[in-house]
């Protein structure tokens, strides 16, 4: 295999064994199957014999793809391990075979690819280039992809101008390959051509990156290229391209503005760079982008100053210029918050808070402050304002007030009262601020007149405060905010008569709040108009429903009782009955207790107890225990302890199960003190049905101590234990009680560490078996009881 086989065929290689194949081919020399069988039979023969057969077959069947492909693979395999430089003739012979095959098989891409792969191993760039061109001309466009892939890879391996020319042709066929082309241009240092190709990409309306890069990334790559190699991109209108990108990516333009400025820095145009930085900061729309530009600007100025200092010759002019520039840079740094404020206002010009913040930044310059206020009032849309637009006007007026220019302040307030604010309360605040200004300068009458004019309206107004279709100015007289201020103002500087008229006007407009009712009543009370004060409370409870009415009744009744005490008994009782008539159970407890206390102090004890008994039926279930506690005390004080039995009995009937236990314990304790042991035992028995022995241990402990002291083991103690087992069985089978018990145990017992639990069990000692009760005080007596029970 190491020797080169000449193409000249020796027909003496045909031997007797080949006679059947030869005879068959004589009969039909164009039989493909016959030739293939013949060739296959001699796969193990010498190369000369196989070449002879392939050449004869190709001569008879020059258009057979199968024969040519096998033949070419044979010839390529024979020389592929050889050095093409030292065996050029052998490679040329194989090349000739490929050329002959392509005469009729020029539409077969596999043959072309096999040929091109073979050629690319040979040092003949021109022939390879021509063969690629021939393949592209011969094959249809749909089959060009594989050829171009081979062509471009080969071109990249060769490099230089050859690669450039190949890619220039390729990107006309496949525009998305332009990114690879740009990378090659950059590797070769052809920066101007790379920039021109970037410009071509950026000018396209739509570009889909083969490398999955966003358009913004491509802009940044172009920017970096231009900034790093400004001297090689002179044929491109760099500023125009950058500004197109800034316009296109307005939300991410910070880096593009910075790159444009750096481009001017690289070409030495420092003033143009500064103006670019300024323009960027004045047009950017986000704080993030502003920060990028500002930081780059400051870095540039610091580097420029450092360079000036190093290059300074030490003369006075240079020192003065450097000092001036340093002061200018410090001023720029100090103005950073103001620049950020500019950005935020560009984002939303209706942001009132930012306008006010801008005033604070410029508070040392009166002219600029006035200009800011003027611009804000001119540009902010009242219906779109973010924040309180009224505050803007008030602060503007306050600015002139600080300079004692009250006339100008009044002009601003006058204009502010005609602005169509989003809410009525905002307009009300403007009027209040105006009045406050007048008060600060002792113009009390002017302040009263202002607010009076603001709330002036027809005697009978049917306008709804919540009607958004009407302007705030039309609805202002229904604003409780401005009326509350007006009332406070009138109380401070007016008379009782004028103040009463205003309060009455508030009631006429039907905008009275609970606070207005209380304030009006207190005002009248302070001026000794007690009956009028009580009338206001009556108007208040008629206006408002519960729970507001409950608070008003509480105040009304308390003040009425305090005023008249026991002198108007029937009237006071009527008021209490009126208060309780429509009072929901959840609010009636306080009124009943107040009523009972009144009767006890100024009326009859019997009537007080009767009220408490009625309260026990009327209040909500959760409040009944408190009522019964008071009732028990009152009955015991007035009628003796024996009289409390009926109260206890009624309480046990009406209280909830959880509250009955405590009531039974108290009842039994009372009977025990009276010596009524049997009655006490019956009470314990009655209460036991509500007490789970595993949960309500206090109840059963109290009963056990009672039986130990007053009972006998043979009967009462045994009966108690029987009842206890019965009750426990009942609770064990009641799913509702099981759930309650589990919840109670979970809430009462925190999770315990296993080691702590083990230590606790050891410290507690042995536990009693189920059904037995361990005694803490007298083990012998307990064992006696349990033994007798068994």
Curated annotation (Swiss-Prot):
Chain intervals for the UniProt region annotation (Disordered): 769-790
HAT repeats: 12-44, 45-77, 89-121, 123-157, 159-190, 193-228, 233-266, 268-303, 331-364, 368-402, 404-440, 457-492, 494-526, 528-562, 567-601, 639-673, 675-709
GO cellular component, one term: spliceosomal complex
InterPro entries recorded: HAT, HAT_Syf1-like_N, HAT_Syf1_central, HAT_Syf1_CNRKL1_C, Syf1-like, TPR-like_helical_dom_sf
Predominant subcellular localization, coarse grouping: nucleus
Keyword Transmembrane helix part of the UniProt annotation: no
Keyword vocabulary terms for this entry: mRNA processing, mRNA splicing, Nucleus, Repeat, Spliceosome
GO BP annotations listed: generation of catalytic spliceosome for first transesterification step; mRNA cis splicing, via spliceosome; mRNA splicing, via spliceosome
Keyword Repeat (UniProt): yes
Biased composition (Polar residues): 775-790
Domain of life according to the entry: Eukaryota
Cell compartments where the protein resides: Nucleus
UniProt-listed SMART domains: HAT (SM00386)
Function: Involved in pre-mRNA splicing and cell cycle progression.
Family assignment from sequence similarity: Belongs to the crooked-neck family.
Assembly and oligomerization: Belongs to the 40S cdc5-associated complex (or cwf complex), a spliceosome sub-complex reminiscent of a late-stage spliceosome composed of the U2, U5 and U6 snRNAs and at least brr2, cdc5, cwf2/prp3, cwf3/syf1, cwf4/syf3, cwf5/ecm2, spp42/cwf6, cwf7/spf27, cwf8, cwf9, cwf10, cwf11, cwf12, prp45/cwf13, cwf14, cwf15, cwf16, cwf17, cwf18, cwf19, cwf20, cwf21, cwf22, cwf23, cwf24, cwf25, cwf26, cyp7/cwf27, cwf28, cwf29/ist3, lea1, msl1, prp5/cwf1, prp10, prp12/sap130, prp17, prp22, sap61, sap62, sap114, sap145, slu7, smb1, smd1, smd3, smf1, smg1 and syf2.
Name this polypeptide is given: Pre-mRNA-splicing factor cwf3
Source organism of this protein record: Schizosaccharomyces pombe (strain 972 / ATCC 24843)
Organism lineage string: Eukaryota, Fungi, Dikarya, Ascomycota, Taphrinomycotina
């Amino acid at each position: 295999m190491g020797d080169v086989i000449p193409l000249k065929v020796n027909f003496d290689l045909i031997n007797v064994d080949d006679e059947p194949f030869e005879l068959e081919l004589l009969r039909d020399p164009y039989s493909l199957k016959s030739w293939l069988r013949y060739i296959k039979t001699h796969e193990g023969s010498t190369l000369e014999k196989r070449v002879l057969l392939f050449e004869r077959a190709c001569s008879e069947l020059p258009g057979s793809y199968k024969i040519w492909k096998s033949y070419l693979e044979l010839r390529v395999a024979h020389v592929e391990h050889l050095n093409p430089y030292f065996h050029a003739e052998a490679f040329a012979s194989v090349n000739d075979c490929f050329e002959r095959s392509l005469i009729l098989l020029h539409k077969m891409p596999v043959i072309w690819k096999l040929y091109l792969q073979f050629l690319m191993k040979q040092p003949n760039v021109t022939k390879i280039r021509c063969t690629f061109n021939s393949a592209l001309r011969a094959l249809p466009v749909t089959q060009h992809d594989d050829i171009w892939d081979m062509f471009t890879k080969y071109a990249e391996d060769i490099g230089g101008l050859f690669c450039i020319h190949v890619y220039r042709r390729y990107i006309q066929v496949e525009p998305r390959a332009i990114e690879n082309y740009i990378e090659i241009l950059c590797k070769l240092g052809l920066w101007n051509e790379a920039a021109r190709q970037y410009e071509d990409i950026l000018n396209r309306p739509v570009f889909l990156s083969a490398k999955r890069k966003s358009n913004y990334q491509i802009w940044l790559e172009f920017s970096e290229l231009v900034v790093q190699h400004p001297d090689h991109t002179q044929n491109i209108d760099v500023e125009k391209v950058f500004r197109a990108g800034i316009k296109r990516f307005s939300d991410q333009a910070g880096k593009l503005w910075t790159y444009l400025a750096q481009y001017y820095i690289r070409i030495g145009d420092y003033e143009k760079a500064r103006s670019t930085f300024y323009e960027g900061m004045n047009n950017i729309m986000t704080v993030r982008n502003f920060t990028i530009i500002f930081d780059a600007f400051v870095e540039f100025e610091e580097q420029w100053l450092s360079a000036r200092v190093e290059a300074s010759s030490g003369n006075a002019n240079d020192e003065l210029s450097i000092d001036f520039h340093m002061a200018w840079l410090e001023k720029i740094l100090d103005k950073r918050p103001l620049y950020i404020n500019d950005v935020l206002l560009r984002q939303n010009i209706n942001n009132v808070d930012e306008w006010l913040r801008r005033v604070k930044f410029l508070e040392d310059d009166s002219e600029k402050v006035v200009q800011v206020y003027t611009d804000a009032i001119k540009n902010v849309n009242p219906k779109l304002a973010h924040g309180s637009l009224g505050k803007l006007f008030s602060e503007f007026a306050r600015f002139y007030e600080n300079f004692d220019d009250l006339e100008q302040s009044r002009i601003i307030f006058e204009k502010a009262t005609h602005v169509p604010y989003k809410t009525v309360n905002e307009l009300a605040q403007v009027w209040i601020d105006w009045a406050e200004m007048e008060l600060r300068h002792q113009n009390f009458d002017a302040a009263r007149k202002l607010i009076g004019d603001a709330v002036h309206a027809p005697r009978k107004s049917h306008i709804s405060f919540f009607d958004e279709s009407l302007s705030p100015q039309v609805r202002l007289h229904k604003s409780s905010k401005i009326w509350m201020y007006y009332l406070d103002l009138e109380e401070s500087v007016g008379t009782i008569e004028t103040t009463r008229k205003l309060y009455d006007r508030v009631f006429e407009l039907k905008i009275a709040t609970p606070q207005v009712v209380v304030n009006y009543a207190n005002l009248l009370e302070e001026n000794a108009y007690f009956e009028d004060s009580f009338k206001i409370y009556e108007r208040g409870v008629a206006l408002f429903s519960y729970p507001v009415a409950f608070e008003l009744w509480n105040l009304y009744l308390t003040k009425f009782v305090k005023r008249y005490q026991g002198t108007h008994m029937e009237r006071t009782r009527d008021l209490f009955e009126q208060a309780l008539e429509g009072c929901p159970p959840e609010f009636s407890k306080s009124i009943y207790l107040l009523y009972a206390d009144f009767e006890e102090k100024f009326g009859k004890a019997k009537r007080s107890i009767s009220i408490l008994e009625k309260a026990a039926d009327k209040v909500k279930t959760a409040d009944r225990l408190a009522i019964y506690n008071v009732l028990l005390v009152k009955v015991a004080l007035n009628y003796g302890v024996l009289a409390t039995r009926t109260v206890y009995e009624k309480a046990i009937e009406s209280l909830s199960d959880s509250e009955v236990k405590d009531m039974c314990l108290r009842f039994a304790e009372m009977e025990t003190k009276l010596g009524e042991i049997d009655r006490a035992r019956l009470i314990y028995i009655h209460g036991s049905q509500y007490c789970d022995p595993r949960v309500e241990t206090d109840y059963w402990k109290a009963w056990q101590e009672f039986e130990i002291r007053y009972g006998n083991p043979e009967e009462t103690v045994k009966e108690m234990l029987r009842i206890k087992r019965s009750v426990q069985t009942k609770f064990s089978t009641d799913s509702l009680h099981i759930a309650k018990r589990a919840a109670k145990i979970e809430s009462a017992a925190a999770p315990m560490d296993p080691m702590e639990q083990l230590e606790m069990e050891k410290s507690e000692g042995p536990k009693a078996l189920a059904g037995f009760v361990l005694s803490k005080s007298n083990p012998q007596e307990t064992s006696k009881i349990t033994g007798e029970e068994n």
